[in-house]
Amino acid sequence: MALLIITTILWAFSFSFYGEYLAGHVDSYFAVLVRVGLAALVFLPFLRTRGNSLKTVGLYMLVGAMQLGVMYMLSFRAYLYLTVSELLLFTVLTPLYITLIYDIMSKRRLRWGYAFSALLAVIGAGIIRYDQVTDHFWTGLLLVQLSNITFAIGMVGYKRLMETRPMPQHNAFAWFYLGAFLVAVIAWFLLGNAQKMPQTTLQWGILVFLGVVASGIG
């Protein structure tokens, strides 16, 4: 329980730190690259290939690329359109997406009640901002929901892999973050803006915190 509380606090700070000091000032793709790159370095000593097939390693990397690489890219872009509090509010749909995607991947009967709940939540988001709804708002909302969905796909994929192709969790996380790092490198070279690099010690410090502490240790 203590570890869960500590992790929750670290993640709570990470949202505010990025929104206050990095969003709009530092290129979001570079921020993702540094965050997952540093986290990958934390887990690098646990990287093992022995006993794992190339397909298994590739699947763990693919899941990591989706859950962390693509998810961070989408959520970091969303900060340009939403406030930190709005972004946090709109992440409440993630458990619903996890349930729905798990049903689909498990070939179970889809629980439409959860799908309807997700739809109501989106409508509710519009009502909350009914007097200030703009194209920017809807763009941000869409980015957060896509981020939620990619995170949910990764969560379900990881659970399925641990059931069908198990490996020690610290080893799995090493491949996980390596996959996220590779997709972040590609995104940075294709879409990144080299003119918006960190300019202050504080910005670099926050990136180190996000990568080593929030993602690596947390």
Give the ranges of each region predicted by the language model.
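Glycine-/small-residue-enriched transmembrane alpha-helix faces in small-molecule transporters
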Residues: 1-30, 133-160, 182-186
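Hydrophobic/aromatic residues within transmembrane alpha-helices
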Residues: 21, 31, 78, 104-106, ...
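Specific transmembrane alpha-helical segments of multi-pass solute transporters/efflux pumps
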Residues: 10, 14-15, 44-91, 127, ...
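Membrane-interface helix termini and inter-helical loops of multi-pass transporters
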Residues: 16-28, 80, 126-139, 164, ...
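Structural signature of hydrophobic alpha-helical transmembrane segments
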Residues: 20-38, 76-94, 139-150, 202-212
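C-terminal transmembrane-helix exit sites in multi-pass transporters
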Residues: 42-51, 75, 94-116
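Hydrophobic transmembrane alpha-helices of multi-pass small-molecule transport proteins
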Residues: 43, 110-130, 148, 184-185
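Transmembrane alpha-helices of multi-pass small-molecule transport proteins
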Residues: 24-70, 97-98, 150-157, 174-191
